[in-house]
Structures are given as structure tokens and as C-alpha cells.
Amino acid sequence: MEKYLSVTTLTKYLKMKFDKDPYLERVYLTGQVSNFRKRPTHQYFSLKDDHAVIQATIWSGIYQKLGFDLEEGMKINVIGRVQVYEPSGNYSIIIEKAEPDGVGALAIQFEQLKKKLTEEGLFQERFKQALPQFSKRIGVVTSRSGAVIRDIITTVSRRFPGVDILLYPTKVQGEGAAEEIARNIARANQRDDLDLLIIGRGGGSIEDLWAFNEEIVVRAIFESRLPVISSVGHETDVTLADFVADRRAATPTAAAELATPVTKLDVLAHLQNQEKRMVTAVRNVLSKKQEALKKCSQSVIFRQPERLYDGYLQRLDQLQLRLKQSLRTRISDNKQLVQARTHQLVQLSPVTKIQRYQDRLGQLDKLLGSQMALVYDAKVAEAKRLSEALLMLDTSRIVARGYAIVKKEESVVDSVESLKKKDQVTLLMRDGQVELEVKDVKTKEI
């Protein structure tokens, strides 16, 4: 009887065969990218031809080192190993290396980055800076030992002696070159005494020049405050640095010429031309002044110089007359002012003030005497009237006239309403007093 295998057993067997097959451990495969959608980490897609499809995987670390981005429909050559994925039973190729078929990976990467940066606008003319006419100090980012720096120094010294060249020794190819180029561009921009920056290197293969195609270098040039001249490779070599730089030069010598657009000979010629123009201008002015002097020497004033100051003599007489009149007026005004001030001083003199106060005091003394007499007479009359009123109120005088005063408990009784039957009262009379008891109280009818 036949023994039936489980799916798992069969899949494990197939996986074991795949893993141990020496032909599947390293497979060279060509195909067209299909079902590709770029992911942030690992990449999963298909490779196909006209008759078959195989699943493909590139781990993130491998993909980052490819140097180009996969695109849908791109034909690529890959090296990898074939494996079986047990849970699904599918087999796939794990890619360890890949490159575009027919076109180099660097060319693909160049076009992809160029497209990206073009869409961002980094290569637009509106961002290009004008190169200075006269540079005092030029920075150069290149190798210390290459011919580039020698050609630049020679050309600049010949065209305009006195311009300083500041070299930033830089690795221009190989691992880490792009980062160093970008770093030195940033360093140069930190200085305030640089007017211009030249970056470049000599010729070489696309791999040798690749550092100048790296995105970090392109962005460093774009962000440069200083105008940048790119001189990378030969005239036929084109890099992304050339697109973003403010100017491109085919050779280091051409870069130095762009950096010094005005030469020493140009300046000397300009100065000589200016000198000629100044000499001509001075001669013209001198000629005009001589002609004017000649005309002046023939004028009436020069023939009869005394007429030159006739008008001034007349003016002097007028001023003298006005001065005398002004002095007389000033003296008169001052006399009147002195008289007024003298009168004021007299009025303000202590003797005058004392006399006025004495006169006023005499007047007040007389007025006070008369007022005091009037007050005295009024007070005497008032005292007499009050005395008579007091006498009228004296009880002894009242009882002497035959009247009697009734008192109850030391209080004078002035109304029957203050009394009631059996009240004890005292009757004060002229020659004594009588103690009485009230028998009855009768109110006077009105």
C-alpha cells in the first residue's frame, strides 16, 4: 500500500532539495521587474519574462547599496539564491546583487537623481548667482596633489596678481569623498573674506567622477552663499555638480579665467584710457578758464579798477549814517529807561516807604480813637439798660412793692397747676415768710 505524504513533509523535502542544490545556491537571473511598489524597508516584487514569473526579495541593507531605484518594467540582471517559503509553499529568489540590464547602474542613478532634483527646481536659472568682477580671495575645493590647483594658481597669478587662493584639501573620489566635498563647501561658506568658490578635479571614469553626482554634494552647492564654479573632468564629462553650479568650466584653467573676468592688462588699459580722458578733460577746462580770464582782463573793471569799489563806498556812507542814527536812538532810549528806573527806585526807597507807613498809621490811629469812643458809649448804654433790667428782676424790690413770692421746695411757683391740695408752700413777703398748706386749687377761667 502506498504511503501518503503530508503537505508539510513534501514542502520540507522540497525546501531541503532547494537548499542543498549547488545550482540554486547562486543563481544568475535576468528578468523584468513587475508588481513593484517601493517600501521603506525590504522590497518585494516579481521577476518575469514572456513565459514565467518568480517572486523576488531584496533586504533593505542590500537595496540601499544598489545605487539606483527599481522601477516597474525595468529589466535587471540579478545574483541570488532560490529558497522555498514553507507556509505558502512558494519559491522565490533572494537577491544579493542587481544591476540594470544593458545600462550601468550609475547611469540609471544619475538620471533618477537628475530627474528628482530637476523637479525640485535646483537647476533653475533663477537660482544662479552672478560671478564677481573683482575677487580678492578665491576658495578652491579639490585635491592638494592634483594638477587642478596648480593650473588655477598659475592662471589666476598670470591674469590678476595679488588675488589670494585658499585651498581646501579634499578627497575627490572613492568612499567618503562626497561627504568631504560637501563639508568643505560648507566650511568655505563660513568665511566672510571669500568672494568665490571653485570645486573640481581632473578627468577620469564615471566612477572616478561619481562623488560630484552625489545628492549631498549637489545640495551643498545649491545652498552655497558663495558663487560656485564647477570644473569636473574633461569637457565631455558632465556631472550633476555642473547643473547646479552658478557656472561650469571645462578645465581648471577655464575656471580660473571665469573667476578673474577682468585681468591685470584690462585694468591697466582701463586706467590708461581713464588717464587720457582726464587729461583731455583738464585741458578743456583749462582752455575755457584761460578764455574766461582773457575776457575778464579786457573788461572795464580791470581797465579802471577804482570803479570796482565805487558802489562799496556809497554803501559804506549809508551804513555810517544808519549807525549814527541807531546810536542816537539807543542813547535816548537808555536815558528814558534810566529815568524810569530812578523813579522806581525812589518809590521803592525805605525812607519813602516809612513815610507812607507813618501817614497811614496816623490815619488809622485817628480812626481807631473815634471808633473806640463810639464803642465805649454803646457799651455804657447797654450796661445801663441791662442794669435796669436786672433791677426789675430783683425779688427784694418785688416784695417791697407789696407782692409776695410763692415757693415750693425752694422752687418758685408760677402756676396753680404746679400745686395740689395739702402741698406745703412758703410765702415770701417784704418782712419775712409764711409757711402755708394748700387747702384747695382753683384754676382761673379764661
Curated annotation (Swiss-Prot):
Record key words, sorted: Cytoplasm, Exonuclease, Hydrolase, Nuclease
One example of a Gene Ontology biological process annotation: DNA catabolic process
GO molecular function, one term: exodeoxyribonuclease VII activity
Top-level taxon of the source organism: Bacteria
A Gene Ontology term for the protein's cellular component: exodeoxyribonuclease VII complex
Protein EC: 3.1.11.6
Family: Belongs to the XseA family.
Designated name of the protein: Exodeoxyribonuclease 7 large subunit
Record organism: Streptococcus pneumoniae (strain Taiwan19F-14)
